[in-house]
Amino acid sequence: MLVRSDLDLKLDNTEILNSKIMKELKGTKTEANLQTAFAGESMARNKYTYYASKAKKDGYVQIGKLFEETANNEKEHAKIWFKLLHGGEMPDTATNLLDAAEGENYEWTDMYAGFAVEAREEGFEEIAILFEKVAAIEKMHEERYRKLLANVEGGLVFSRDEDMMWECSNCGHVVIGKKAPEICPVCKHAKSYFMIHATNF
């Protein structure tokens, strides 16, 4: 029996992702199938995570761990289909923030609003209220993503006009200044680990 190495499979996947086929997917049944596969694997991943938690609560730690392992497998399967749908690459963070903001906007302005109306019409008042409450959360998510996008586009993630307390999320070291340091002087982690120190407690 021929056993192929992970490297062989990775090289094969890279060749597929970089092929001309990617440009020809738009509007095809295969594109629709990739979208369905992504949705199915994403849903399975969440479901198995819930099952893992329940199995552990029921006293089945091994079964819980196997559900978690399978959930991680499904996550990776979903990533394959997601990347194929995006030309073989993960979009950049600004693109992802915009996509996330637009998705959250749809959820609170259209999807959950409509779901609440229909639930209320069918006599499910408590479910209608839940839809509305979750819609309010999605609105906050949209606002957060749009603020983060503005920070990325404006170069404000690691730099501000006034002095800030920049905290290393790895070791907790705090630096005061207009910019986060390129490297943490304590743990040597990169600038990407710094964030504005939060005092919301």
Regions found by a protein language model. Name each.
Residues L2-V3:
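Short, small-residue-biased leader/transition segments that mark boundaries at the very start
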Residues L7-L9:
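Short hydrophobic targeting helices and cationic amphipathic motifs
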Residues I21-F201:
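Non-heme di-metal
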